Amino acid sequence: MFLPADKSDEVDLAKTYDAIVVGSGAGGGMAAHVLTSHGMQVLLLEAGKKLNINQELKSMEWPYDHPRRGDMPPDSHALSGREYTIRQPPYAQASPYKHVYSYIEDGNGSDYAKDIVVDEKDHPYTGTPYAWVRARCLGGKTNIWGRLALRLSDCDFKAASRDGFGEDWPISYADISPYYDKVDLYLGISGHKENLPYLPDSLFQRAVRLNPAEVKLRESLAKTGRVLTPYRAGVTTDGLKHNKYRVHCYGRGACDRRVGGCDIHAAFDSPTGLIYPALETGNLTLRTNATVAEVTVDKDTGKASGVSFIDTDTGKSYTAKGRSVLLAASTLESARLLLLSKSSLYPNGIGNSSGHVGHNFCEHLMGPGVYGLNKELVGKPRTLDDGRPGSFYVPRYRNLTDRSSKFLRGYGFEGGSGAGMFPDNAYSTPGFGSSYKKTVRDYGGAFIGMGGFGEVLPRYENYVELDPDVKDRWGVPVLRFHIKFGDNEKKMAADMADSAREMFEDAGIQVLSVTREILTEGYSIHELGTARMGSDPKKSVVNQFQQSHDVKNLLVVDGSTHVSASCQNPTWTIMALCWRSCDHLAEELKKGNV
């Protein structure tokens, strides 16, 4: 494993960079990679600190080797799922704890990511209930993401033409497919080809192996025309010869018992996958602890002239200059930054002549699912499943050819079975001593479960705005949420639960429980759509190359620009779109068109 020396530099405030990139996650890291490969001088600004992820995650460490077995220290608290439903944000207000973190920290190994996610006391927000998971450190949430790497298809890009709701994307699968290929080859992805038109295959490396329970469910689903495929993980299983910072997956870590992350970097993360290689070009300047508070504007040309940022340690403000500005701060933070960037030229926020910034929010609903037992596997030899980066995925099957009368769009399932370090039945099994241990071992690998991820429709009335009164620790106005699931999501959730039960029963799996409750808005961490792309400047914020309709040298290259959520996880699409947009920007800058 090679880790680079600290190459982060102080920003040359007298210099005009070819591009300033705000945020270092999936979109920001990809922008840094692509633009530096074009020979451009790039400034990358990250609001959080640079962490040694190897020391933070410790996936090879036994729980008993860590203080409190990985649980939070006494002065810290992770919000529970129930707290999001019975309280209103800001959730840390009046809390007796010194530090308050999002729900992602609630569970085994919660102490392992406390330096990655934000302290809610420093970063409040207001409005409707919303489970907002934020990471402020180099690489952002890619340090702890769930690793499911899926493509979208024309079933998603042209969904509005199919069912009449919302807007089509201004691109087709043919436009983005070559860039999906580039992401696959550069970062690595494991999976199995299924030849599904609605879930295109990637250029896969070796797939995760299904265990006997999962094979049984796969064979049962095939009889009804449904598919269970090995988890399509953004993980290199065969290795990458072009990247010295990452090694191939050994299946040895604690992928299933941490909040996420991979300290050998087999799973993609932005620092080792994109930023460290970009630093080696000599074209990238990295500045951490830099919270961007405004996109600055040239009053004569109306173009973006750079950004102003706050040093998160000292509170001092600085201004950096750039020929172009790319926002990749995350869907909600990028919308916040656009709204914060008000001027006489852009009184409603930069790039917001349409009034759509912050609106058309969409994501994935979570909660409904099923949990069961394969009786024939009780007492059978256990499989090693704790180190798999994922187990299986059941792609969408609703509203593909026949239209459901109940709801629009569709959903998929993520699931898994097998033996882990913490068997599912360990807490609920009665008894003590050797007989108790034997029962836990005998049943530990026989359980199987899966949970749904459903498409949340983009609606103008689901939006965020700046709170006029509440500010964060650095005096920057925070977001106020106006986001609620609608009837379509509720009907979809009911079908999710019923369908999940049916699939398990048909496979001969004993159903132990069915979950019908929808988790709080935001729980999926797949927020999308607050600066959507489109061909009509009156109904969208950016064009097909994620370029502002109003300010041609301003781009938004994160999930903000997604027109709809589909039911597939968005990370791979964010990076493919960003690569495409950055190639276009580099060419336009060379031509003098930006």
Where are these regions (language model features)?
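A short, basic/flexible loop-to-alpha-helix module at the beginning of a structural domain
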Residues: 1-16
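N-terminal Rossmann-like FAD-binding beta1-loop-alpha1 element of flavoenzymes
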Residues: 19-44
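Residue-level detector of alpha-helix initiation sites
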Residues: 25-26, 332, 561
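Glycine-rich loop(s) and the adjacent beta-strand/alpha-helix scaffold that form part
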Residues: 37, 41, 47-72, 281, ...
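FAD cofactor-binding and catalytic pocket of flavoenzymes
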Residues: 101-141, 169-173, 354-479, 487, ...
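A glycine-rich dinucleotide-binding beta-alpha-beta segment and adjacent secondary-structure elements
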Residues: 230-237, 246-255, 293-296, 445-456, ...
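A conserved FAD-binding loop/helix module that cradles the flavin
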Residues: 564-583
